[in-house]
Amino acid sequence: MFSEDQFFKDILANPEAKRFMLNSLSTGETEGGKDLHRVAEHCVDPELKVKVERHFRDEIKHGVLFAKHLRAMGHEPTPLDPALDYDKQLQALDFGTSVARINDPRPFDEEDWILFFVGSKVTEETANRDMPTLRRGFESDLDLLQTMDEVMEDEVRHVTYATEELQRLAARGHAERIDRMLKRHRRLEARAYRNVSVAFIDRITRILGYPFILRWTMKTACHVQYLWKLAFPGPGLEAPRAGILPSPAPAPEKAAAAQ
C-alpha cells in the first residue's frame, strides 16, 4: 500500500523531484520572510522590533539552508510559479497585512499589529503542523534532517511570540475581535494552502511518474483537508503545545561512527 513514507523515499531517490522540493522550500521561506524587515521598521517598541527582526533573519536563514542543499545538487534557487507561491496566493485573498500597508512609512498602530500578528500566527501554525511531516520524510538524509531540526526550532518560537503578542493585545480589550479574525484568516489560509498543495502534488507526482489514479487520490486528499479546516478552523488564542519538537538529529559524523 502506498504511504507517506514511500512518497518521500521516491522524492529523495529522484533528483528532479528532490530539486523541485528543495527549491519550493528555499524560495518559499525566503519569499515568506522578505517583508518582515520592512515590518520591523514600523515598530516604535524597541523590544518588539528586535523580535520581528529576528523573525526576518530566521526566515532568510531557512531559505539559505535549503538553498545550500539545492546547490549541493548543482542547482540554484529559482522563482516559484504563481500557482506554487503561497505568499502570492495569500495576498490575492486579502490575507493579513497588505503589501501597500507594509510599504507605507507610517508606524503601525494597534489595529495594524493585530492584523499582522493574526496573519503571522495562522501561517506559523501551518508551518509548525507541516514541519514534523517533512522531518519524518527526510530521516534518511542526515544533512537535511539537521536542517529540519533547526528550522523547526525557529518555527516554534515564531508561533509562540505571535501568540504572546496577540494575547497582550487581547488583554487591552480586543479578545473577541482577535478570535473572529483568527477564524476568518484560518479559512483564508486553508484556501491558499489547498491551492498550493494541489499544484505542488500535481507537479511532483508527474515528475515521479505516478499513475493518474494515485495523482487524483492525493489531490483529492488536499480538497478533503481543506473542507475539514473550513468546518473546524481551530482554537483561539491558546499558546502552542509544548514539547512538540522531536529529538535532534545526530551529527552526520557521529552517525557514521556509530555504524
Functional labels for PLM-detected ranges:
Residues M1-Q259:
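Non-heme di-metal
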